[in-house]
Amino acid sequence: MASIAVTTTTTTTTAEFVTSPRTSIVPEQPNTLHDVIAQAVDSYPLHELGFITSSAHDSSIQTKTFSAFNQYVRNLARAMLEWGKPTGSVVVVYLTEHEDNMTAVWACLLAGFVPCLQPALSAQQAHKEGHVAHIKNLFGSATWLTSELGAEQINSISGLEVHLLSELKSSAEKFTVAADWVAYEAKPDDEAILFLTSGSTGFSKAVVHTHRTILAACRAKGQSYGLTSESQVLNWVGFDHVAGSLEMHITPLLYGASQLHVHASAILADPLRLLRLIDEKSIELAFAPNFLLSKLTRDLEKRTDLFGSFDLSSIKRINSGGEAVVSKTAQAFAATMKQLSKNPSAVSFVISAGFGMTETCAGCIYDPVDVLKNKPAHEFLDLGRPINGCEMRIVDPEDGATLRPDGESGELQVRGPMVFVRYYNNAEATSSSFVEGGWYRTGDVGIIENGVMRLSGRIKDTVIVHGVSYGIPELETYLQTVEGVTHSFLAAAPYRAPGQETEGFIIFYSPTFDLNGADASTKLFATHRALRDICVKMITLPPQFVVPIPVNQMEKTTLGKLSRARLISLFKQGQLAQHIARSEELLSEARGATFVAPSTETEKALAKIYAGIFNLAESEMSASDNFFELGGTSIDVIRLKREGEAHFGLPEIPTIQILKHPVVSSLANYVNALLSKDSQTEEYDPIVPLQLTGNKTPIFFVHPGVGEVLIFVNLAKYFQNERPFYALRARGFEPGHPFFTSMDEMVSCYAAAVKRTQATGPYAIAGYSYGGVVAFEVAKRLEAMGDEVKFTGLINIPPHIADRMHEIDWTGGMLNLSYFLGLVSKHDANDLAPALRPMTRNEQLEVVWKLSPPERLVELQLTPGKLDHWVDIAGSLIECGKDYNPSGSVSAVDVFYAIPLRGSKADWLNNQLKPWSGFSRGDASYTDVPGQHYTLMDFDHVPQFQKIFRGRLEARGL
């Protein structure tokens, strides 16, 4: 009989996986979190907690010793008592910075309250209000501790008791309590911290962790990591996540280890910062999910100029979780780390993929492995063995109890002292999550082989995109509304193809029409396009496959449901191949109805280039195909430009002409004009049509201060089949086109261009950065002409810009542009100016040129002369803004704000952006968006930005 897959880990077994030969010693065994902070202060008073905020530089690390932090939070806890809340009251902590969250949590604990960490609220008003109301009902009351920004986000919900952290800090200044003061002596089984689930399958549940569950987890984690009081730990995971607060804060605190907590945006915006911090702070333990490992590797493996630049010998372990870790990605990352190191032979660390959930205090199963010395056996890294005290087993998912043999897949269940005790005020959900014997049903499908676990799927209704869980039921609800889909005969199922780095999904559905009918191709094409559009707009990802299955062949369970697991199984076995083939046949037929075969040699050559970029058959390419409707991105534009120039032997095909001529036949005509040297200087037209499909009101987007509009390409594709998207590009890029000399000249030109493109209102105008004030003036001009402007979008720009324009000299403008283009890091853009200013322009350009990644220069087709000219264009726009003084008003403004170039986000909003209200006749809207000033529309942030932006358009009736 095969062995049964039940695994537990003892101290002896775990020792094999300790990443350091040092012994992890906890001086005493604390029973509560109160004991943890007291012990840390007594034993290591001068060890430090460091913080890098969302807007700080590497040199701006704010630190507090354990002793100073302890005194600070106890004073805050004393001030909290003035709220008059009874012991055990739940306080919802809604803050963004690590230090603020950490401070608030400890203050709540010491005051005898129970903190509940609230992740970022939805940008969708209805969803946000529904969630906050749910939290209020769940806890029976609603006490929130937040910032001014957070308070503004929840001010539309009545019945909340809101306290500002800034006011609490002021109140605490009058107290100096004893270093061991507490308002309440906690007990091990008291509720300690509540964590909210993602809410991916409905409203969030509140996971209850006691002092006992948290300490059981943290002790075992620290032993697994080999932590000591001399360790240095780096964390950038948000504090509202169990990995950030428990795994990377309380665990090292338990062992007396110093910590550095970095805002996630600081790492994502500048991946090199992670390496600099490992080098400068001798970091031993860090965390990086698969998508960050992949991003770091892509960004750094070609930076040959950085090879040998860092001392990375201190790093011993990098934990990874949130999504499966691709083995090849882990190996490439480890190899790149060695190349970047000053002493590659001294670099020896493990990448430890792991399994954990909010319900298990984050990671409880790990597989630390040196991926360069030990080649992974599977496509994804194994997840390993349980930490001390944790057990795991694989069972039949139907009954949740019958054990599966070693090597056979089934439902993963875990148990141990680190597993949560219950869901707050939700006995039904708690009961359904456990089976006899105290085993917790994780909802994941796994395999245990020789004591090592790996996942093979998921029972729960979620799909993970770059580490973020999205609820499948909610997605299906919207997909069911598409014309052509038979009601209740649609299922979306997670799927990861072999070799694919991130998870995707497949849509299975039964069409309302006959797949063999006369008009089947037209209806199928429209249905699939509508399904794709909903997916992109809801979860930022199109389906990998859409499989139409006739109703009479779509089997349901006895409960009348579609089985996602069964559909995926049929797909993998090839049993749906006939339906997929029929779908492809009909879609080809639909394309054929509008198919125009490329006829000229130029059209054929461009069609071949298009096919190569989009991985399509050359025979499928039509002369009427639009580059952006095929899915073209800003990076694809550069590739098309480069390949076109090489094929036709042209010195340059201007990027703007690709944007203006995205259709094969139109671009071919332009190329032919270049080849015949018959391309006369075109009359300047600021309008660049990036997306022309859809019937809703078009959106016009004014360029940022660099004048170019390539930044909008990735945003525009989200508006396909919804509304046209036009960008306005500055004058001066093309030969014979002079720069603008005043704001009035620019606004007059742009307003006239908008009117030529869309004769009558209502209008929707937006501008990014500098373009925001231009958009405001264009909106005023259109209203003065008697037209209605229903939307004026202002992206991270204040109304008063003249002072800032006067601050920017040629050097500052050149460095801003260079950072925007990805030629230099934010760190260099901020620090180089004093050294460059005494140099000549050519010398300054030469310095930046040498710092620029060679592949980026090739990608942008830049030369020193082109960069110099581009700086002059940006400079001309700065000159136009030096005398700008806003006046008048528009019907309403929608302001979108991100992390500013300098200063805090709160100051940026309240003191710089809020004055827009004085220029809005209606209610002004202020909406927080992810990212920093220069990154809010980049590849990583545009999926979220488009959802938020489109939400505001809808709110304005567009």
Curated annotation (Swiss-Prot):
Thiolation and peptide carrier (T) domain as annotated region, ranges: 602-672
Keyword Phosphoprotein: yes
Region (Adenylation (A) domain): 60-465
InterPro entries per the UniProt record, alphabetical: AB_hydrolase_fold (IPR029058), ACP-like_sf (IPR036736), AMP-bd_C_sf (IPR045851), AMP-binding_CS (IPR020845), AMP-dep_synth/lig_dom (IPR000873), ANL_N_sf (IPR042099), ATP-dep_AMP-bd_enzyme (IPR050237), PKS_thioesterase (IPR020802)
GO biological process: biosynthetic process
Thermoactivity: Optimum temperature is 23 degrees Celsius.
Positions of the Carrier domain: 597-675
Keyword Phosphoprotein: yes
PROSITE patterns given in the database record: AMP_BINDING, CARRIER
Keywords of this entry: Phosphopantetheine, Phosphoprotein, Transferase
Assigned EC number: 2.3.1.-
Domain of life according to the entry: Eukaryota
Region Thioesterase (TE) domain, annotated ranges: 698-946
Modified residues (O-(pantetheine 4'-phosphoryl)serine): S634
SMART domains: PKS_TE
Field pH dependence: Optimum pH is 7.5.
Pathway assigned in UniProt: Secondary metabolite biosynthesis
An example molecular function term from Gene Ontology annotations: transferase activity
Family membership: Belongs to the ATP-dependent AMP-binding enzyme family.
The protein's role, per its UniProt record: An L-tyrosine:2-oxoglutarate aminotransferase and atromentin synthetase greA catalyze consecutive steps to turn over L-tyrosine into atromentin, which represents the generic precursor molecule for the entire terphenylquinone and pulvinic acid family of pigments, which are widely distributed secondary metabolites in homobasidiomycetes. The first step catalyzed by the aminotransferase converts L-tyrosine in to 4-hydroxyphenylpyruvate (4-HPP).
Entry-linked PANTHER family: LONG-CHAIN-FATTY-ACID--COA LIGASE (PTHR43767), SURFACTIN SYNTHASE SUBUNIT 1 (PTHR43767:SF10)
Entry protein name: Atromentin synthetase greA
Origin species: Suillus grevillei (Larch bolete)
GN (gene name): greA
